[in-house]
Swiss-Prot record:
This is C4-dicarboxylate transport protein 2. Its main location: membrane. It comes from Bradyrhizobium sp. (strain ORS 278). Responsible for the transport of dicarboxylates such as succinate, fumarate, and malate from the periplasm across the membrane. Belongs to the dicarboxylate/amino acid:cation symporter (DAACS) (TC 2.A.23) family. GO terms for cellular component: plasma membrane. Pfam families: SDF. The keyword Coiled coil does not apply. Disulfide bonds: none annotated. It is found in: Cell inner membrane. It is a multi-pass membrane protein. The gene is dctA2.
Length: 445
């Protein structure tokens, strides 16, 4: 029997055989989403009840409850287990290089598609600026200097309580280096942190049993509140964004996967549970802990996963990048504001900065859009009201693209570091190891 290192998995013989289809999590979530769509469509008054909405909101809060401790424990543990401090810096630099290159491709793809399919022309929109005033106000915090300063927490306890990913990540990195510097004296504390991570993953396993309920509530409320009629003439933008995000995953991420030696489609199938949870909640953050655990099972290096994935939730949001450039062009077309080539280059540069302040929570993409428009051309800001009503329908695909991109990023950086178990990856993706036959294990001694 092969034991995993630290927080990992081991293969054990199946005692009961295959699970019945109705007990598989992704099947339950998918059924819940479909039921939510039907209830929201046929019974909108019931679906918009506060208690229905609370089902989705409550599930997201349960997940967010454990994100900060998971990030802290995994990052600290990952760094503390590394003997060479320079390796942490090397992994971080490689991750940032990857993030910038892939993010640029995502932004460029949005610009190219937006120019090739100018569906905003002829809309003759007269937006209500008041509808987006709150988002514009929040966008003020996305200025470059403020963004850098906001990474530094006023209080570690406050950062953990708020679940601020970047602030927790900064403290975890510093704490991990300090623990590594202690050498033998720090091993006992390191083991305690490892055990704490196992306990938190146990909490996640309990919370995930409520995933179908949360997905049902979130989807029913969304359809009940907005309904198919809410799409109106903006259905073209939604469809165009879906297609563009799909092209990015298949072409850009697909080529990266093929370069490493696996199929993007098999990878998507491998993380289907996490994708369906994200689809139901429209928040890529809701699947962060499970994604990290699954990437380790896939053969990715634990330290790499612990550093790349949490960082990617602020620095590698591919779906948000596509959305920002595509939506900016759509708004300018709808308002009759022609953007020159130099202005579009400005959009690209500004979006590369403002997107770094986004996090994997619902609505973050809309806030970063406000920040981008405010810098590029303030006259475009009122046009955000045009896409305000349909933002919810695009946030799901943003989140799906974000989580897929971060998963591929962790695999790529692990490969770049020479710490990707290719044999295990192929066996997992080819389903030669059944996920139902795998249990989490703790290495002792």
């Amino acid at each position: 029997m092969a034991a995993a290192t630290d927080i990992g998995t081991r293969d054990v013989p199946s005692q009961t055989g295959k699970k019945p289809w109705y007990s598989i999590l992704y099947v339950q979530v998918l059924i819940a989403i479909l039921i939510g769509i039907v209830v929201g469509w046929l019974f909108p008054n019931l679906a918009t009840n506060d208690w229905i909405k609370a089902l989705g909101d409550g599930f997201i809060k349960l997940i967010k409850m454990v994100i900060a401790p998971i990030i802290f424990c995994t990052v600290v543990s990952g760094i503390a287990h590394i003997q060479n401090a320079s390796k942490v810096g090397r992994v971080g630099v490689k991750a940032l290089v990857y993030f910038e290159i892939v993010s640029t491709f995502a932004l460029l793809l949005g610009l190219i598609v937006g120019n090739l399919a100018p569906i905003g022309h002829g809309l003759a929109a007269k937006p209500d600026a008041a509808a987006v005033a709150n988002y514009v106000k929040q966008a003020e915090a996305q200025k470059s200097v403020d963004f850098v300063l906001n990474i530094i927490p006023d209080s570690v306890v406050g950062a953990l309580a708020r679940g601020d990913i970047l602030q927790v990540l900064l403290f975890a990195i510093l704490f991990g280096f300090a623990l590594m510097a202690l050498g033998e004296r720090g091993h006992r504390l390191r083991d305690i942190i490892d055990d704490t991570a196992h306990a938190v993953f146990g909490v996640i396993a309990i919370v995930m049993k409520a995933a179908p309920v949360g997905a049902f509530g979130a989807m029913a409320f969304t359809i009940g509140k907005y309904g198919p009629a809410a799409l109106g003439n903006l259905i073209g933008l939604i469809a165009l964004f879906y297609i563009t995000a799909g092209l990015f995953v298949v072409i850009v991420l697909g080529l990266i996967a093929r370069f490493i030696g696996f199929s993007i489609f098999k990878f998507v199938a491998y993380i289907k549970d996490e994708l369906l949870i994200v689809l139901g909640t429209s928040s890529s953050e809701s699947a962060l802990p499970q994604l990290m655990e699954k990437l380790e099972r896939l053969g990715c290096s634990k330290p790499v996963v612990g550093l790349v994935v949490p960082t990617g939730y602020s620095f590698n949001l591919d779906g948000t990048n596509i959305y920002m450039t595509l939506a900016t062009l759509f708004i300018s077309q709808a308002l009759g504001v022609d953007l020159s080539f130099s202005q579009q280059v400005t959009i690209l540069i500004v979006a590369m900065l403002t997107s770094k302040g986004a996090s994997g929570v619902t609505g973050a993409g809309f806030i970063t859009l406000a920040a981008t428009l405010s810098v590029v051309n303030p006259a475009l800001v009122p046009g955000m009201a045009i896409v305000f009503s349909i933002d919810k329908f695009m946030s799901e695909v943003r989140a799906l693209t974000n989580i897929t991109g971060n998963g591929i990023a962790a695999v790529f950086v692990s490969w770049w570091e020479g710490e990707l178990d290719h044999d295990l990856l192929q066996r997992r993706l080819n389903q030669q190891i059944d996920p139902s036959d795998v249990e989490t294990a703790v290495t002792t001694g």
